[in-house]
């Protein structure tokens, strides 16, 4: 199945994509993206869409790796999309069950990351 995150997993590459500026790409599970936006909402009150969750997931992994390797620096990501229009999907527990998405393992990993700086990917 392709991604349930809008705009991710499309068969075409957007004209604005500039591969020369990409340092690294990683696969992010849909459940991880959705756990990230729910964490953002819980911590900040900000509604964000799934692609923002994908960015947060990647940023958390990068920060954890930097800490583990002793690297200092800044990590910047974008809050790409508002999430209000996803109230009946990404933010709806019944929808998650219908889609067979379990965000709890990711939510637990994010809490652990925020408390320790260590992030490990749950087994899928």
Which positions does each model-derived feature cover?
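Buried hydrophobic packing segments
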Residues: 37, 55-63
